[in-house]
Amino acid sequence: VFFDYDDDNLREDALSDLLAISKLMKENSRYTLLVEGHADERGTREYNLALSERRARAVEDFLVASGVSSFNIEVVGYGEEKPVDLNSNEAAWSKNRRAELYFIK
């Protein structure tokens, strides 16, 4: 799930994927979903940690509103610590402003 610069609102292009994940979670309630929030390198470390957690919480809030139990969701914010693209340009930053979702037992 990707986010706009300095924003924790879900984008329209993420909603269908999140609805599909919601459906899977409701059908497989024995699993836990780990939601990892991330930010690009711009901003202070503290700000980016808070922003990345808000992004992860936005995903969690959407899934809970669609019927997934909050008991089955864990969230963590990593700030800028785990970039997928190490370059310092808009193309890289847009890839790093994200939330990643993992199914765990």
What are these regions (language model features)?
Residues 36-105:
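Periplasmic OmpA-like peptidoglycan-binding domain that tethers envelope proteins to the cell wall
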